[in-house]
Amino acid sequence: MTLLPTQELYSEILPGLWQGGTHDFDTLEYPKQYPIWNQEKLFDSVATLYAVAHPVGWGISERRFGFPDSALDEENLPDIHAMADWVYEEWKSGKKVLVRCQAGWNRSGLVTALALMKDGQKAKDAIDLIRARRSPHALCNADFAAYLNSICE
């Protein structure tokens, strides 16, 4: 992902819950430089939603489900909700959790919003929080935002 001049790769949405993207060279087409096993880890758990992102390093729990940043395919909804449930459980257990996709705006925004809604937030509040903390461009995929606004968790 090519970062905007003021954008960080990861943003903390609420304490312990992070949303972000994948660095341009952290994809399967480039060799991965894995950290040494005892290197300080940034996150305890990572939800990866970008299919070509490299796996995370040693000692970090990772769940992966790649899906496109396009029209929402109903066949993917059970897996998307399962990912949000896992993110919520990891976060609420006190772990530092990253939800990542390519740019860190839409797929990660959808799963992060679902986790926030599971925590009691309304869709609009979750979307507004993500846009305030991550990027005003987050959840610019109208299908994802409309889906969030159409459900009650």
Residue ranges and their predicted role:
Residues 3-97, 117-147:
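Cysteine-based protein phosphatase catalytic domain of the PTP/DSP
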Residues 148-152:
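The feature captures the conserved acid-bearing segment of alpha/beta-hydrolase catalytic domains
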Residues 94-113, 117:
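A phosphate-binding catalytic loop at a beta-strand-loop-alpha-helix junction
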